[in-house]
From Swiss-Prot:
BP-aspect Gene Ontology terms: mitochondrial translation
PANTHER family in alphabetical order: 37S RIBOSOMAL PROTEIN S25, MITOCHONDRIAL (PTHR37799), SMALL RIBOSOMAL SUBUNIT PROTEIN MS23 (PTHR37799:SF1)
Gene: rsm25
Cellular-component GO terms for this entry: mitochondrial small ribosomal subunit; mitochondrion
Source species: Schizosaccharomyces pombe (strain 972 / ATCC 24843)
Pfam families, sorted: MRP-S25
Function summary: Component of the mitochondrial ribosome (mitoribosome), a dedicated translation machinery responsible for the synthesis of mitochondrial genome-encoded proteins, including at least some of the essential transmembrane subunits of the mitochondrial respiratory chain. The mitoribosomes are attached to the mitochondrial inner membrane and translation products are cotranslationally integrated into the membrane.
Complex and partners: Component of the mitochondrial small ribosomal subunit (mt-SSU). Mature yeast 74S mitochondrial ribosomes consist of a small (37S) and a large (54S) subunit. The 37S small subunit contains a 15S ribosomal RNA (15S mt-rRNA) and at least 32 different proteins. The 54S large subunit contains a 21S rRNA (21S mt-rRNA) and at least 45 different proteins.
Keywords in alphabetical order: Mitochondrion, Ribonucleoprotein, Ribosomal protein
Superkingdom of the organism of origin: Eukaryota
Single GO MF annotation: structural constituent of ribosome
Localization (cell): Mitochondrion
Protein name per Swiss-Prot or TrEMBL: Small ribosomal subunit protein mS23
InterPro entries cross-referenced by the UniProt entry: Ribosomal_mS23_fun
Amino acid sequence: MPKFNANGLLRSFAAEMKKPWTAESLWYETVAKHPPTFQYARRIVPLYDPNKVKSRGKRLRKSMYQPQEIQWPEDKLRKRFYRDHPWELARPQIIAENDGNDQQYCDWSHMDQPRKALSGESVVQRTLWLIENSNMPVENAYDQARKEFYHLRAEQEIQQRVAHDQAQALGAVFTKSDLELGYEMDQNALNSWFDNASQYAEANRTKFTDPSVDISKTTQ
C-alpha cells in the first residue's frame, strides 16, 4: 500500500513547490485540474479482533459458579426500617444464633413478645403477619407496626426512667457509663495536647527575643 494517496500527494507537492529549488512536475497541473474522486489506497479491515471479541465460554464460566440471588419480603422491610431508624442499630443486640423456630413460640398477632426483645425484627415480623392475616396493604401494615413499636419503646423508656429514679431514692449510686468514660479520656488527651502546644508556641515566640530559651524542654 502506498504511503500517500493521490490527494495527499498533490497537497504535499504543492507545499514543496513553494520552495525556490523545487521545479513543477509535468503531472501536477493535470492532477490539480482533475483530482481523484475516491480513495485509491486500499484499506484493510480486520475481520477478527481478539481484544474486542469474547468467547461465549468465558461469559458462561463467570456466572456458572455464582449463587442465584435470593430475595425475601423481609429483606425489603428490614432495610427500610433501619434506613428510617439508624439509631436502632446502636442498641445492644444478642448475636447468638437461635434454633430458627421462632414461629413456634412467637405470636405476632401482637407486637410484644415475652421471649424476644423488642427490635426492628419485631416490626418486620409484625408487618408480615398483618399482610398475611389481615389482608392489609404493605404500607398500611408497616405504618401500624411502626406505631405499635413506638408505643412499646416509649413504655420501656418510661419504665427504665422510673426504675432509675426509684433506685436513686433508695440510695443507689450509678457510675459513669463506658461511653461517658471514653469521652472523658478523649477530653483529657485533648487538653494535654492543647497545653503542650500552647507551651511550645509561647516558647517559639520568645525565642526571637531570648535565644537562651530551649524549646525542646517545653515538649517534655
